């Protein structure tokens, strides 16, 4: 499509809006967003002269209110994003603290397990030593009983042995 295809639009704009002279300056065509060409619909232009703005204080007041509302909305958005960032940092710090705490507890548990294994090993060694001593005592007692049985004993020795054995 060339520029010549829109000659009918130029003719309509030159004679005014639908033949009404003097009003064409306040109206501008709506442009298609992709091609930036007039689409055939009309609306009031955005560029309003200063004397028109001053003549409508209500519109100026509304414009200022909208401007302030947009500024407040933008500030709230920035504040919300800042709060979310702070919350994310706090959550990350809490997760890091939790991880350090969990690591410390795991280390403490590992030390306690190692100590428990050491104590079990020592307990096993002490039990074996006690069994060895008990067996030696039994062997010594048997040997002593054999020696006493092989010796002739006097009546006094028998009384002594019976007293020691009963005591």
Swiss-Prot record:
* GO BP, sorted A to Z: response to testosterone
Sequence segments annotated as region (Disordered): 140-167
* Family matches, as InterPro entries: FAM167_domain
Q: In which tissues is it expressed?
A: Preferentially expressed in testis both in embryo and adult. Expressed at much lower level in other tissues.
State the name under which the record lists this protein: Alanine- and arginine-rich domain-containing protein
Q: What phylogenetic lineage does the species belong to?
A: Eukaryota, Metazoa, Chordata, Craniata, Vertebrata
């Amino acid at each position: 499509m060339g520029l010549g295809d829109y000659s009918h639009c130029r003719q309509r704009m030159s004679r005014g809006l639908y033949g009404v002279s003097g009003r064409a300056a306040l109206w501008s065509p709506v442009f298609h967003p992709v091609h930036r060409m007039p689409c055939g619909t009309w609306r009031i232009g955005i560029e309003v002269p200063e004397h028109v703005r001053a003549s409508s204080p209500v519109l100026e007041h509304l414009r200022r209110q909208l401007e302030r509302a947009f500024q407040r909305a933008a500030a709230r958005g920035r504040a919300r994003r800042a709060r979310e960032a702070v919350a994310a940092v706090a959550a990350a710090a809490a997760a890091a603290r939790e991880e350090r705490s969990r690591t410390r507890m795991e280390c403490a548990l590992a030390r306690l397990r190692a100590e428990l294994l050491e104590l079990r090993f020592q307990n096993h060694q002490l039990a074996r030593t006690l069994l060895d001593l008990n067996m030696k005592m039994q062997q010594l007692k048997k040997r002593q009983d054999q020696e006493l049985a092989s010796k002739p004993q006097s009546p006094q020795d028998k009384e002594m042995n019976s007293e020691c054995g009963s005591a």
